[in-house]
């Protein structure tokens, strides 16, 4: 995991981004370190279906982190040897949440969680319990790259196969934390390599 600061060259606005490497599956979007999200949901009820009530939940200060998600994860699938850089579409998740349901059982669950679903019963994300007895994996705002695929945008335009080249994963991970100057230098090297490959194979540039 790496925390960096990105600056908009047009507006000069700076904002933090948390770069993370995760396996394909559960992905933490926010730690909810002040433990505000779960108590808010618990105060509303076990099944929340009213649209106005759901809108008020998202507008509540406890859910401010939902509109400030700054996680850029490199997702890897070791079995299929492929990787993907995904961005969670928080605005779409918010707009398409049809109901929120408290779940206390299943999949070896030790603590309850509130799960968010769309109108087709598709999983979007969840708020985990997270009190003093819970560890870092049992609290905060989470989603799942397998179960919530429609709510992600792929920076790499889909999965990238690295079965033939493990260096590719290192290239992605290093590129995420390097500067624009570093990107330019690397790009020139890659362009030169492509030119060499074309020449070796008799392909016109």
Language-model features, listed with the residues they occupy:
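Nucleic-acid endonuclease domains
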Residues: 1-2, 7-12, 21-205
């Amino acid at each position: 995991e790496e925390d960096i600061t990105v600056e908009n060259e047009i507006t000069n606005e700076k904002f933090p981004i948390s770069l993370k490497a995760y396996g394909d599956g559960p992905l933490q979007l926010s730690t909810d370190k002040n433990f505000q999200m779960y108590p808010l949901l618990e105060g509303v009820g076990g099944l929340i279906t009213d649209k106005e009530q759901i809108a008020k939940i998202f507008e509540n200060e406890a859910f401010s982190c939902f509109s400030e998600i700054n996680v850029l994860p490199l997702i890897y699938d070791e079995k299929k040897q492929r990787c993907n850089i995904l961005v969670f579409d928080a605005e779409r998740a918010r707009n398409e949440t049809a109901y929120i349901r408290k779940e206390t059982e299943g999949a070896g669950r030790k603590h309850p969680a509130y799960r968010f679903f769309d109108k087709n019963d598709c999983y979007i994300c969840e708020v985990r319990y997270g009190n003093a007895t819970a560890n870092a994996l049992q609290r905060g705002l989470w989603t799942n790259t397998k179960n919530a695929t429609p709510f992600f945008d792929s920076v790499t335009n889909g999965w990238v196969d690295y079965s033939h080249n493990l260096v590719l994963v290192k290239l992605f991970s290093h590129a995420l934390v390097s500067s624009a100057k570093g990107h330019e230098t690397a790009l020139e090297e890659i362009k030169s390599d492509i030119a060499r490959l074309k020449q070796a194979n008799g392909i016109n540039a």
